[in-house]
């Protein structure tokens, strides 16, 4: 029994037209059939009527779980199955059972009264008999007669005269079957109810229920005027039944009969007898009250079942009427006037949305709209049905949101809580069974103007939100659970209409439920259950992502946050061992979808009052449930992706996938793919909106939005850290114009995530820009008609006031200005507002700061604010009101208040986690605090929803578009956004747990993540998850391998088998694990661990080899290695681990991985080979110190090569790029065993490759044979190289006909072998090459192997190890050329071009000879090669064209002398000094001589190359080697003298230019620069006797003191520079001698033009002037001596005299050969160049003092003698013309002491001739 003190919940009789406004779309769900709840008790004449089955007994038996035996209508089975018995324990089960019993009892009743009761359709078709009554009417008369007879037997009825008379009047009428007024029956029942006798009322109610089932009372029949206000008989009877019992405790049978009667009225299917509007609500209200106040649990259960049945019938009628009207009616147009009319705070239109906005909603203006009774649409069946459905739903919502006092909340069995629960359950049932009706856009209100065009979901939207916001955070488990179910329906079926609301509930309710520490176990568990059901829906997950995470207007990334919240539960789980059996936990973790409504009677077992305490066991349950959620998410994503890929492969476009998905189990389409949605309203303008929807339907557009949203978050975070940088970043990314303060202010005002403290500091800054932004920011607020304190509160909610007084001052100044602008009459001026605002801020700090002990009083506050209103005082009452307001309600940020409110849920109250068990003894403070925190969360949720709906009402319709999921491409970005929390959730159990089921869940999750990552090429994610798995294998520490590690290994093997095509670089980790696994298997069978080193640890050691940590370094050999291995054996491998790792499953899995490589794609097999090569190399290097290294992976590498032998050439080319490099390394490995195995494997593979015809094409043979060449070129041991040659020889012998492109590589092997220093290798190579030349020459020529063969023989010639083989190889090259010559001559008939013949046949042989000449180690070989080369040039070059000779000269002849060219590296020349000397003395001499012979013989064709050859000779002449210079001189002279007659003018011009250039390049001009020889400080070094030295005249010697002076240190650079100058001086002398000798040759002098001789003479004159200038600079020469470059005083006397002598000799010779009296320009030029210089030389010689310049005197004497002799030999005319130039110079010679006799004789002759000439002249004159 219920406590009588508890208030009865009376549901008000709401008007029929009371409705709400919302509009949304529908979604099809299966229809639910109608079942009967009430059992109609027949009162036939037999005794069974009185002893019939009672409703209460049936319900009671059903509630207690007893099996109720019923007879099926078809009498096929009289027993109930266990499943059916279980179903009858629920209200739905009772409904079904009652329906069966109703049918059975109706059948009995009809048989008793012999008048069958037809159904509605039959009754409508019956024809009245002529007697005037139908069979149905006769049946009703029987029931009425029975009732009257029972009433007559009751004394109370007979005492009532009116009632007695009425019964006596009615009975005959009923018996005679005459027509009568039905109001008489109503009047009879009225008398019965007025009697207040239970017996009478029970009979009446029983009769009424039967009449109602016969549709006896109609809404068309009206009561007479005398009865009161006119109303229908149907309403009159329903009111009587409802009023028959009150809210006090009454007889249980009477309550049951009332329930039965009301159920009969509600279930009546006749159109005129259906209940609508207020009548229906009145009936439902009475059923609701009976459920609450029922006399027993049985009555409450029956009332609950009847109430459920009534609600179900209302919606079934709506479905039926809509289905019927849909066939004839068209889709109505949406009424644009439909808007939402919640009561909003109009003063805060822009306030941030919080969760408090829903529950604080007031009444809707649509609750009192009037129905237009004249509109025919109002009276239609469909319109009546939709109104009934809405009214019932709204009533349930209103009952569900009623506030409940805390003491009632603690009593779950109280009327208030039971009323809330039944309401919530009915709401859930309505939404679950009829969601398609709610969303059907064709089902709209039509008869009510205010509701016209609305759908059910539109009208009910605010009520659904209100219900959830008020109850979603309830601490009562039952309430929270059903709210979770309702929210799931919102997400599952209605998410397109509740886009923003879903985000709010996730953000404000369900995410905090998982994140906060102290939410109860029940709340966390049911939240996870609902999330799990959402996770099972792939489309819902994808739509959550694209509509929230990819929506730039959404503040919450729902999908991403969902994974983060789930992962927190997983990672925060218990670490201690669970004592309970894990198998007991698993059944409780199933996803519980609500299948039936539980009984909610007072003593129901489903009403438990306690909240389950969180324990280690329950924490573990939550952890498992969280893992299951993660697994379901991954499975859904995988299914969606695979389904989309499957459809795309079938050619189905992405736009069609949403429709095809309806037939695909993997992508179930629970969201209809129709039109886009805006603000929850479907757009009927399909054409206008489809374009924008399609534009954003591209996955790349969603990802662009996602990235843009992420970038905005980054910018805001940057602003929160550094405002100026954040604004700059926002401007750079075009979020805001940094030059527009208004734009910045609006962005800061509306953007989410802005740190309010940072914002306050920025707005308070004193710079001009910040002040402008602050002004615009405050202007965004509206203070119209707001109280001053409220306006200040609104301002300070936008940002946190900075602490600096100047910043506060600036903000308050602007605030006061803004407030007074919008409220000009508030104060006298803005100064008043400014001072008061500042005063209020100080007051708020004073009153609420815990640091201030002496608080400000009201009087102090009033006193402080006197005279601020323009000199006047503000009203004291007003200031007192302000003081009280601040005292009671602190000005604080709402965020701080909300955080403080939910603090009990964030912090642990005690050491135990979660809630403590609520006890009945006293008030639990923890429980109260948590309830208050939950209430605060609910308030926040309702506030958010309120503001959300306000924004939807006043915002743009197209700002909130809901997109359906149609693309599988979203899955990749979804995983990218959430892989980190997924990894955290899945990794934690692998580290700590030993439970198989939990581990299996985690490993399944890993597999799914890798699968998705592989599908979308997410390399980072794939590698991260696979590396995580490899870390959990523990194969690097065999003693620690446990069951979970073996499970991880098996998972990795499964991943390798299933995802091989997409693993890419992750193959390395998997194959490393396989290698480690093979190592563990060997250890398990008894192999010493030291013989199988650990690959992973070895790799770590190599990586950390430079780190000095002893823990990370292990030496490869020595005692350290042995001791380390010994320690690793301290803990042997467990037998269980060995058994698992050596199981058949593992072995077959490994084999399957390798055998399945043949089915991998082209790119995947390359990745596999690459990874296996790396692992194999790790094995080899880790065991390099062992005699038998690990070759497991190398063996597998060869094995899979055989598996994949049938792949096409393109794929093998890619594979061999990897495999070839690997064989290069292993083939040249230091360990002989490794190299031998690799080479033998390579030989076998090569044999197979050669057999494949396709691989012989192009260059693949060359590639797969490359490792042989690489090994031969490496520094490996000779034995390995011998093996290479043997392998190559075997392949040639066995497969020579198959070798095509591989010849190039094979000859490469021979080439590198020919370079070896081993005579064995050289001998093997020579024998093989000779055999190929002699036996297979034609084959090699066909394969174009001439060049390769010549290169091999060339290398043998160059190798000086075996001279005999070198000379034999050289002879073979000669034979090759001979055969080529014969072939060329025989092929002349085809007339190939000379250039083609040369390049194809001759050029390779010439290059071979050239290479031998330049590089051969043996001089004999060089000489013979040179002879052979020039033999070809001299004897076999008749067909060479000038172009051919040009090529030969530039490619072969000139490079022979290039080592001495200016481009040669001096250091190289110095290092090869010995070789050069040998070369110069042998080969080069012979080459130069042969070259002269060649030029002489082939001068006609080489004429154009003369310049190059002259350069070649000059280059040899200019070397510092005297021998080479002389040879060059001789060759030059021989060339010029022997071919002078062939030279043309241009050729002589080249010769002259050559000599001029040589003189110029070899002149050391730097020698004349004094700073060149400075001591490093910019000043030359002089001796202390410098003045004395400088006073000496030309040619004087230095005193001894100067030689004893210490010299400065000379740098190597200075020394090298001076040596270079000395070499140039020597070259000058050599050039002078060359020119002299060359021009002494009469053949040359006669053919060289005189103009070119003059050019050479000018160069010689410059050389003379340079030497003269140096010799005259005494100070420079002394400097050179002091610095230390020379041991004696340097001079250039030889150069000076030699050049002077050559100069005058050439000029006198030119004069001699020309006309003495010639007047040509050349003659005049010779005269000018000769005679003045002669006079100058004579004067210089005359000035020399013999005693001081003895050396100079002697050197110049031949020059002077030559001058005088040549003058004397001049013709008379020329002699006479130049007497005036030379006479005085000769006179000065007479005065010279110790003059040589020769010179004296020459002077004598000169003066004699002069005298004769002068005397003859005088004589002639006389």
Curated annotation (Swiss-Prot):
Cellular compartments per GO CC: COPI-coated vesicle membrane; ER to Golgi transport vesicle membrane; Golgi cis cisterna; Golgi trans cisterna
Location(s), subcellular: Cytoplasm; Golgi apparatus; Golgi apparatus, trans-Golgi network; Cytoplasmic vesicle, COPI-coated vesicle membrane
Annotated stretches, region: HDS1 domain: 898-1106
Residue positions where Phosphoserine is found in the record: 44, 122, 125, 653, 669, 1110, 1606, 1609
InterPro entries: ARM-type_fold, DCB_dom, Mon2/Sec7/BIG1-like_HDS, Mon2/Sec7/BIG1-like_HUS, Sec7/BIG1-like_C, Sec7_C_sf, Sec7_dom, Sec7_dom_sf
Deleted gene: phenotype: Sensitizes cells to tamoxifen (TAM).
Presence of keyword Secreted: no
Coiled coil segments of this chain: none
Annotated region described as Disordered, given as residue ranges: 1-54, 66-126, 1111-1131, 1584-1610
Composition-biased stretches (Low complexity): 1117-1130, 1597-1610
Residue(s) carrying Phosphothreonine: 597, 654
Principal place of residence: cytoplasm
Transmembrane annotation, as ranges: none
UniProt domain comment: The homology upstream of Sec7 (HUS) box is necessary for the allosteric activation of Ssec71.
Family annotation (PANTHER family): GUANYL-NUCLEOTIDE EXCHANGE FACTOR (PTHR10663), LD29171P (PTHR10663:SF375)
Its job: Guanine exchange factor that acts as an activator of arf1 at the trans-Golgi net-work and is thus involved in vesicular budding and traffic between compartments of the Golgi apparatus. Activation of Arf (ADP-ribosylation factor) GTPases is essential for vesicle formation via recruitment of cargo adapters and coat proteins necessary for Golgi trafficking. Involved in the resistance to tamoxifen (TAM), an anticancer drug used to treat estrogen receptor (ER)-positive breast cancer.
Name of the protein this chain belongs to: ADP-ribosylation factor guanine nucleotide-exchange factor sec72
Organism: Schizosaccharomyces pombe (strain 972 / ATCC 24843) (Fission yeast)
